[in-house]
């Protein structure tokens, strides 16, 4: 009877040990590799750079086996969510990135990671076929031309910088007299451009013609009146994927990333 008891105890001990050994250790569970297909790199920014950013994100995501999620549009539409889960923030101008860091997204951006990616030039978009025969800023300063501009987002003061670049005050005055509406952002300007055909000219960046080629022809501004603003990107302080975020930013400046941005109207460095 005693022998049977000892055998039973030993059997229980052996089974317990086997059960313990069959379970992965807590350390092993902690260090187990993450399934890449579940990784999402969340990236937020304005609508202007979005077409190029989305295409580049798709290529990078396929190469890495992850998803790069691009949320773009006017800042108020995404800033609250970005404060909760953004890994990266991209901008449509240098002052926009500064506004993000100092005002719109307080404490979110790691300012040491901000980098400038690409520039795009200012341009005049006209109705298909250019019925008014617009050739540049001189023409849009003349009476009888109705202009749409953006006074916000990445274009604060853009029209004034363009019109006044050569120091001709009459040209600035002429352009101002012809402005029919100051849109708060490019998205609102695009809606008005497509719905109100009384506008002859949309003073904007070249990239918007690439984004919607059927709605406008591109007329380059005279070199002496052309200005440039940038797209930049930065990693957030809250991101748990900083290394991956840096890899994506690096990719945007790679040969493949550059080709994508050039395709969408941005300038190669």
What is the meaning of each model-derived region?
Residues 22-24, 28-69, 76-84, 93-94, ...:
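Exported/periplasmic ABC-transporter solute-binding proteins
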Residues 1-4:
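Positively charged n-region of N-terminal signal peptides that target proteins for export
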Residues 9-20:
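Bacterial N-terminal signal peptides
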Residues 104-110:
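Short acidic (Asp/Glu) patches
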């Amino acid at each position: 009877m005693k022998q049977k008891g000892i055998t039973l105890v030993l059997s229980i001990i052996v089974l317990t040990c086997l059960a313990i050994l069959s379970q992965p250790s807590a350390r092993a569970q902690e260090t187990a590799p993450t399934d890449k297909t579940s990784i999402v790199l969340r990236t937020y920014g304005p609508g202007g750079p979005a077409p190029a950013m989305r295409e580049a994100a798709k290529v990078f995501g396929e190469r890495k086996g992850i998803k790069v999620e691009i949320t773009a549009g006017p800042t108020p539409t995404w800033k609250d969510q970005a404060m909760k889960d953004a890994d990266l923030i991209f901008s449509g101008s240098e002052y926009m990135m500064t506004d993000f860091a100092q005002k719109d997204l307080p404490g979110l951006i790691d300012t040491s990671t901000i980098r400038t990616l690409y520039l795009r030039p200012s341009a005049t978009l006209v109705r298909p076929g250019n019925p008014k025969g617009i050739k540049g800023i001189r023409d849009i300063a003349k009476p009888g031309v109705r202009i749409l501009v953006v006074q916000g987002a990445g274009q604060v003061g853009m029209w004034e910088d363009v019109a006044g670049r050569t120091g001709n005050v009459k040209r600035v005055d002429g352009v101002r007299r012809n402005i029919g509406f100051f849109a708060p952002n490019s998205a609102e300007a695009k809606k008005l451009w497509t719905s109100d055909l009384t506008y002859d000219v949309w003073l904007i960046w070249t990239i918007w013609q690439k984004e919607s080629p059927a709605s406008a022809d591109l007329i380059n501004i005279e070199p002496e009146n052309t200005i440039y603003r940038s797209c930049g990107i930065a990693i957030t302080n809250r991101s748990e994927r900083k290394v991956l975020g840096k890899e994506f930013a690096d990719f945007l400046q790679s040969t493949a990333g550059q080709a994508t941005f050039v395709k969408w109207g941005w300038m190669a460095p």
